[in-house]
Design a protein with these regions (language model features):
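N-terminal amphipathic, basic-rich helices that act as targeting or association modules
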Residues: 1-64
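ANL superfamily adenylate-forming
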Residues: 96, 179-242
């Protein structure tokens, strides 16, 4: 059963609708946008806290200036935190043939520990944390820990050269940069630590936190934080406005400096 079919059934049952096809559903969604977005938050169980003067849509004559979920509070990571089971959350297999399986319970523990470490550095809502990292579990965890405290995340792949990273991160003035020791591409190992000093000097000299490409008995600085009981006390998730920044992606930079594309919660 598809999500769309399940959603149609939800509307038919809870909103007394009798949609016969997708076109009817679409017409209803644009004619009654407040009802549509309300139903979406209910169907997907989006955690939203209503405040005084909250509006599902603060309308503007220009569509792109509409303010969705105005004055509602939430946090993206709550969608992850509500699952604290031993179900598989991340399954990683590296080019070095190392395999790593992380349950939702373990994922939440690691995110909690890392967010506690961030707070120990006085990183707060609106501050920027960046990752110069390959596609590994630590990258996901670093992002989620940033979201948990209301900080803003951005990242560059570890195969980016120094200039490409500087062009992006220099626009953000990060408080912390998380890096790995190496990455693999097409079966070959590549070190990229030689880029770090140049990059840091051009983006405001943020503190650096190092991890290692996944391996057996990972003793990297980041993994020591995961294991450190000092950071195991439960951290409260920071509630933010729905439209507060969550992460920044960048355009390709083919027509000048890469453009920041900011995504909210």
């Amino acid at each position: 059963i598809s999500n769309l079919y399940a959603y149609e059934n939800y509307l038919n049952k809870n909103y007394k609708k009798k949609f016969k096809n997708y076109s009817q559903l679409w017409n209803w969604s644009v004619k009654y946008p407040s009802d549509f977005w309300k139903s979406i938050t209910e169907f997907y169980q989006v955690p939203l806290i209503k405040n005084k003067n909250s509006k599902l849509i603060q309308k503007n004559t220009k569509f792109w200036k509409n303010n969705f979920f105005y004055n509602f509070q939430t946090n993206y990571i709550q969608l992850i935190e509500k699952n604290n089971s031993n179900d598989l959350a991340i399954h990683f297999i590296g080019e070095n043939y190392h395999e790593e399986k992380i349950t939702y319970k373990e994922l939440n523990l690691r995110v909690n520990a890392l967010s506690s470490y961030y707070r120990s550095l006085k990183i707060k809502k609106g501050d920027v944390v960046v990752g110069y990292l390959p596609n590994i579990a630590d990258t996901i965890i670093s992002f989620l820990a940033s979201a948990k405290i209301g900080a803003v995340w951005s990242s560059c792949s570890s195969d980016f050269g120094a200039k490409a990273v500087i062009d992006r991160f220099s626009q953000l003035k990060p408080k912390l940069m998380i890096v790995a020791d190496h990455y693999f591409y097409n079966g070959k190992k590549f070190e990229y630590s030689k880029n770090l000093r140049q990059i840091r000097s051009k983006i405001g000299n943020p503190k650096t936190l190092k991890t290692s490409y996944p391996c057996k008995n990972n003793r990297s600085e980041l993994h020591r934080i995961y294991r450190n009981k000092k950071y195991h006390l439960e951290e409260k998730t920071k509630l933010v406005d729905f439209n507060d920044p969550l992460y920044v992606l960048f355009s390709s930079g083919t027509t000048g400096l890469p453009k920041c594309i900011t995504h909210g919660h």
